[in-house]
Amino acid sequence: KSCCPNTTGRNIYNTCRFAGGSRERCAKLSGCKIISASTCPSDYPK
């Protein structure tokens, strides 16, 4: 599961993934986190 700090980060992550980027690379690029839990932390709500 990916969690982003804001909508902009989420959009960057989604665009990166759509373009064929890996989850890790896209998370790093967009400032998002990849987590194993089912719910995102409050500081990464998107």
UniProtKB/Swiss-Prot annotation:
<keyword id="KW-0611">Plant defense</keyword>
<comment type="similarity">
    <text>Belongs to the plant thionin (TC 1.C.44) family.</text>
</comment>
<feature type="disulfide bond">
    <location>
        <begin position="4"/>
        <end position="32"/>
    </location>
</feature>
<keyword id="KW-1015">Disulfide bond</keyword>
<comment type="function">
    <text>Thionins are small plant proteins which are toxic to animal cells. They seem to exert their toxic effect at the level of the cell membrane. Their precise function is not known.</text>
</comment>
<comment type="subunit">
    <text>Monomer.</text>
</comment>
<feature type="disulfide bond">
    <location>
        <begin position="3"/>
        <end position="40"/>
    </location>
</feature>
<feature type="disulfide bond">
    <location>
        <begin position="16"/>
        <end position="26"/>
    </location>
</feature>
<keyword id="KW-0800">Toxin</keyword>
<dbReference type="GO" id="GO:0090729">
    <property type="term" value="F:toxin activity"/>
</dbReference>
<dbReference type="GO" id="GO:0005576">
    <property type="term" value="C:extracellular region"/>
</dbReference>
<dbReference type="GO" id="GO:0006952">
    <property type="term" value="P:defense response"/>
</dbReference>
<dbReference type="InterPro" id="IPR001010">
    <property type="entry name" value="Thionin"/>
</dbReference>
<keyword id="KW-0964">Secreted</keyword>
<dbReference type="Pfam" id="PF00321">
    <property type="entry name" value="Thionin"/>
</dbReference>
<dbReference type="InterPro" id="IPR036391">
    <property type="entry name" value="Thionin-like_sf"/>
</dbReference>
<protein>
    <recommendedName>
        <fullName>Viscotoxin-C1</fullName>
    </recommendedName>
</protein>
